[in-house]
């Protein structure tokens, strides 16, 4: 039986109030409780309880009935719900080891306004006098011998290494092909297209990326900065997608975001452990990798 046929057939048996959402929800909760009760029975009598499979089949059928009733009251199609769930779970749990190739957002822009397809950025970490009561640990980033952006410290009472957070923008650039922050710092805004310059590369997009990066960092602290994680909590990925829903990066998938976040925090861990180093980006391969500091890098250039 197809799901659409099932939905039509059980609709005739739905005698609950058509506006009431509570009863279908309570029904779902009740069926979950019944399944748990069946599990308890088989745990108590492993060999003697022979009705387990039949009872589970019936409880699952009732669970589907209540799920369909709830979907109907929310004007949702169970078939569409399940189709979306298949896409989401395959994307989340069947993630290839490396991200597949994709088109870059600025492929049609003049070369001078395209993000560099290959890039090395060096992070230097040094103590700077005069920024506080005590010397402050400060990071500068360089492209070759040229400084990029301003010196950054943690701006926090805690030494949490946020001064290295530009690595997350670089990960967005490498894996997503997107970073309004890095596009601005590298002076590669798409100024020949006024709307793209204003919307995709403008101040709001920059603020969104900075805010999103700070949010993910605050969540990462509770997860040991994802140092042992093979996946990113789904709510973090959903928040990133929600914050960027009006921007071109909305075309990237949850899987893409997961690649970018994991890659960024992997390199962040290496940068902080070694107090600097060089980060290598390849936008075609969608990779961000790390090299240990050269002699003198930790003292600045």
Language model regions located:
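Flexible "arm" and connector segments at domain edges
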Residues: 1-60, 64-301
